[in-house]
């Protein structure tokens, strides 16, 4: 197993460390994920019955006779959304809830995502070997103390690395495991349950990828309740959100254009926003009042640009989204007669337009590397909506718990309250985190996406400005975590070690906590 191949290809040093050629990127992808209505084709739906409203987040299938259909995919690149539009023919109807690799789209455009953007970084596990992946059972047997023959010098160095001022040793947990042998090379308070800060995003990333799949795509749709007479739609247009955390103004503009393509020039009704896929709670449990908006925008199943409206974060993201759609419709030549509002669509409507997000793997990658709280919370609610029937944080963390338990993660002392780690109620142990990291390596279907969600020391994400001049640069990939009472760093050192450091205090010195973490990671990197 070459874990160095999981490092970033951004920067010369990282490319050398990872044994990757500079500028290498993903293979060209064809976009075949979305069928749009095209009024000019003057075709009919093939379905025998009227399209039904979705009972799950999978978009309704709109199979149209005729040739040119518009396909669209949004690409997240360091937080920037970009709309790619092309023309082509769908040879096989794609599964819009999963990666639509089955759908072949013949298009005059060849779209490559790679060297120009972080989201196109190629990072694959090469040469994975069985002994490299220690099982959770072995980890539990060994975690009580370092294995016989452990490098005493390394243990001493790791011990000294953690002993810094203003960080309580009694509230510091650390564990390092040799991936080649499965032996524990260092352990301190590994079973102690501590507040994990943003290390909470690790179980969320794993559960989302395991349950939804790396190719899963969110969708947002416009459904009409009414009839089209001439160029006038008599009725309302419903903007329905299904939890896409990356929905942006450009996507609404494209949706509005698709509505106009039906020949609609006036809506004799209103634009109504439906955010009922999630509950109405805007924050997570156990959050400090100051975290609202400052650390995460208000949570909603329907939010455009994270609820930004007229330069400010709206307390009602869905209503703001409806207003933005109305503006987009007017720009597309569609006038709307009534004022926007929110509501819940309970009747059968006609799907007029649909937007599909980039794959979940890209979204999780951004969430992990940039430690994005909003995305983490949206993923938790999505898990609850899809698998528990309730788009709530409580339902979502229950799904995460069940996923972890299902793969044998030791959950003694673990408590999951939210997705981001902002909650003071969250608890993880170093034992659980290292077991989760090893599970992420062992899962072939999600391994690449899980590993690529980690930041690279001295190269990108939340580790870009850390360990830049140490032996750990480009050798350590990890998830950071910082609040006023907690600090954490968990991840991998090349293909040799998996480690986790959790530190708590009231307050804790983030400065000294990070020094301890960096020394610990550097000692592991120097050990070879």
Predicted regions and their residues:
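Bacterial N-terminal signal peptides
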Residues: 130-143
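Small-residue-rich helix-loop
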Residues: 185-187, 384-528
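A small/polar active-site loop signature that marks catalytic segments
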Residues: 308-444, 448-449
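Short, well-structured active-site flanking segments
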Residues: 210-225, 333-342, 447-451
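Mid-domain, small-residue-enriched loop/turn segments at the edges of structured enzyme/sensor domains
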Residues: 171-173, 230-300, 307, 333-334, ...
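N-terminal targeting segments
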Residues: 5, 9-12, 16-19, 23-34, ...
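Beta-lactamase-like hydrolase cores
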Residues: 141-142, 146-193, 253-263
């Amino acid at each position: 197993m070459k874990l160095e191949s999981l490092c970033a290809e951004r920067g010369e040093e990282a490319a050398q460390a990872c044994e990757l050629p500079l500028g290498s990127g993903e293979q060209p992808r064809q976009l075949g994920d979305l069928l749009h209505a095209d009024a000019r084709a003057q075709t009919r739906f093939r379905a025998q019955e009227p399209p039904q409203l979705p009972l799950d987040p999978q978009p309704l299938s709109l199979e149209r006779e005729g040739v040119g259909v518009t396909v669209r995919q949004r690409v997240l690149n360091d937080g920037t959304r970009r709309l790619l539009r092309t023309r082509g023919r769908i040879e096989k109807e794609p599964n819009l809830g999963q990666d639509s690799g089955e759908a072949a789209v013949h298009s005059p455009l060849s779209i490559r995502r790679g060297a120009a953007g972080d989201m196109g970084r190629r990072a694959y596990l090469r040469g994975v070997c069985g002994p490299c992946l220690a099982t959770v059972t072995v980890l539990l047997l060994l975690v009580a103390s370092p294995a016989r023959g452990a490098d005493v010098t390394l243990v001493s160095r790791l011990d000294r690395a953690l002993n810094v001022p203003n960080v309580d040793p009694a509230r510091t947990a650390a564990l390092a495991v040799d991936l080649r042998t499965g032996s524990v090379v260092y352990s301190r308070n590994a079973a102690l349950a501590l507040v994990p800060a943003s290390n909470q995003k690790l179980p969320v990333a794993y559960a989302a990828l395991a349950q939804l799949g790396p190719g899963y795509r969110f969708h947002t749709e416009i459904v009409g309740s009414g009839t089209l007479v001439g160029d006038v739609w008599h009725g309302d247009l419903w903007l329905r959100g299904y939890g896409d955390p990356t929905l942006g103004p450009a996507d609404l503009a494209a949706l509005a254009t698709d509505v106009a393509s039906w020949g609609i020039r006036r809506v004799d009704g209103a634009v109504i926003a439906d955010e009922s896929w999630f509950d109405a709670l805007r924050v997570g449990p156990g959050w400090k009042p100051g975290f609202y908006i400052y650390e995460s925008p208000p949570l909603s199943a329907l939010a455009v640009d994270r609820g930004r409206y007229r330069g400010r974060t709206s307390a009602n993201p869905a209503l703001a989204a409806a207003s933005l759609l109305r503006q987009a419709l007017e720009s597309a030549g569609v006038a709307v007669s009534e004022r926007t509002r929110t509501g819940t669509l309970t009747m059968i409507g006609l799907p007029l337009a649909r937007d599909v997000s980039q794959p979940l793997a890209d979204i999780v990658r951004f969430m992990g590397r940039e430690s994005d709280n909003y995305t983490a919370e949206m993923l938790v609610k999505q898990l609850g909506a899809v698998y528990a029937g309730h788009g709530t944080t409580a339902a979502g963390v229950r799904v995460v718990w069940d996923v972890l338990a299902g793969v044998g993660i030791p959950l003694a002392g673990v408590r999951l309250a939210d997705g981001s780690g902002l909650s003071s109620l969250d608890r993880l142990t170093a034992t659980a985190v290292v077991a989760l990291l090893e599970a992420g390596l062992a899962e072939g279907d999600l391994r690449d996406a899980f590993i690529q969600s980690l930041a690279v020391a001295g190269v990108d994400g939340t580790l870009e400005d850390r360990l830049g001049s140490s032996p750990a640069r480009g050798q350590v990939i990890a998830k950071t975590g910082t609040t006023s009472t907690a600090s954490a760093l968990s991840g991998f050192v090349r293909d040799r070690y998996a480690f986790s450091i959790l530190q708590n205090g009231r307050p804790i010195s983030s400065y000294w906590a990070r020094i301890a973490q960096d020394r610990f990671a550097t000692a592991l990197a120097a050990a070879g």
